């Protein structure tokens, strides 16, 4: 929509996008930046993990159809309104199998967070990573906290539910770091996450 406001002509056909620019347009335009999809998805998963109801406002739930559907299938209690989503924990989470895919599929940048939720679900859950290599760097750290996870090729097998115990763990990247924070929220005893500077790249004032 920003490009269209500048006068560009955009044509989308299948996986091909054609953009015809408009260099003659010098008019000022106003455009509102949308919320961060991955940051919001992280908080949705946090809401499914924690005890109290969480309400996330000023978002467009239509952008999260896949993520919300996954959380609903796992048993999370979700209510959707025009510009907000409320989510709360279900003590009897269900296992699920997912695979990462480019938008509008399930994002690779949420699989680490979802894996934490899967550790609390009954039965065997699976995540197949189709986007990046070496995307399961958080698994050894989650296992240190008591998670039962196996990696075979590009698929993670998560056995649950597992009782997580606080430990000193190390963040290897942005999404791995926030997954360890989520695990620490539900773990027994204190969790220390080292290399926390990774978080600052994607989460503003996460501690608040």
Give the residues covered by each predicted segment.
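Short, structured segments at the rim of ligand-binding sites
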Residues: 1-208
């Amino acid at each position: 929509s920003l490009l269209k406001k500048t006068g560009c002509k955009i044509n989308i056909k299948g996986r091909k996008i054609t953009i015809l620019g408009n260099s003659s347009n010098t008019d000022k335009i106003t455009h509102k930046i949308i919320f961060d999809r991955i940051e919001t998805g992280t908080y949705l998963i946090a809401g499914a993990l924690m005890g109290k109801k969480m309400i996330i406002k000023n978002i467009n739930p239509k952008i999260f159809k896949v993520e919300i559907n996954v959380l609903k299938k796992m048993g999370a209690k979700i209510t959707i309104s025009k510009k907000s989503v409320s989510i709360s924990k279900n003590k009897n989470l269900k296992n699920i199998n997912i695979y990462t895919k480019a938008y509008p599929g399930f994002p690779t940048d949420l699989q680490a967070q979802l894996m934490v939720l899967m550790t609390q679900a009954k039965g065997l859950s699976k995540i197949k990573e189709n986007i990046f290599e070496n995307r399961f760097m958080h698994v050894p750290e989650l296992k240190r906290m008591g998670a039962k996870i196996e990696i075979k090729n590009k698929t993670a097998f998560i056995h649950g539910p597992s009782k997580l115990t606080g430990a000193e763990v190390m963040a290897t990247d942005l999404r791995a770091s926030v997954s360890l924070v989520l695990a620490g929220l539900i773990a027994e005893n204190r969790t220390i996450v080292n290399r926390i500077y990774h978080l600052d790249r994607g989460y503003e004032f996460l501690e608040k």
